[in-house]
């Protein structure tokens, strides 16, 4: 009941889609901080073919020591959340940084710190079929290019 009332009051303050995404991101972050797993419907093609638009993903909270290259993680941007594959972990000035990349993206994402990481994708549902996240690392550069070409083609075909 509390959650429903809270969402109702939040929805009254939302004027734009951007506001809605920020509120949902904040709510997801709060739930993950409390140890709750999230079931979210994916949108976009940045993780194609591992995660496709309409797939359901399960995001669970993750401890820093459990973050491994190849894992698919969710991290917080200013107004939304990004779900990409962790490709590099490095330390600078006694602080750990994590770099992700979408499976069909041309470039790496900006470095993020652990406090920006919301959780790790534990499962992907394609329809009713449960898929485990592909923890292959490193992904060859040619695979990124191939995935990008497929994504461009799918975007082009959606216009027809």
Language-model-detected regions and their locations in the chain:
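Extended hydrophobic leader/signal-anchor segments used for secretion and membrane insertion
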Residues: 2-160
């Amino acid at each position: 009941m509390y959650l429903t009332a809270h969402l109702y009051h939040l929805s009254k303050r939302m004027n734009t889609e951007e506001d809605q995404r920020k509120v949902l991101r904040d709510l997801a972050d709060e739930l993950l901080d409390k140890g709750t797993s999230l079931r979210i419907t994916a949108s976009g093609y940045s993780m194609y073919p591992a995660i496709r638009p309409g797939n359901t993903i399960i995001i669970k909270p993750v401890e820093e020591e459990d973050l491994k290259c190849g894992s698919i993680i969710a991290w917080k941007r200013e107004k939304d959340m990004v779900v990409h594959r962790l490709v590099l972990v490095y330390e600078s000035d006694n602080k750990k940084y994590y770099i992700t990349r979408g499976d069909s993206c041309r470039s790496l994402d900006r470095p993020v710190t652990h406090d920006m990481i919301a959780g790790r994708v534990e499962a992907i549902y394609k329809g009713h079929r449960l898929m485990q996240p592909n923890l292959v690392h490193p992904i060859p550069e040619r695979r990124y290019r191939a995935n990008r070409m497929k994504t461009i083609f799918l975007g082009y075909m959606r216009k027809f």
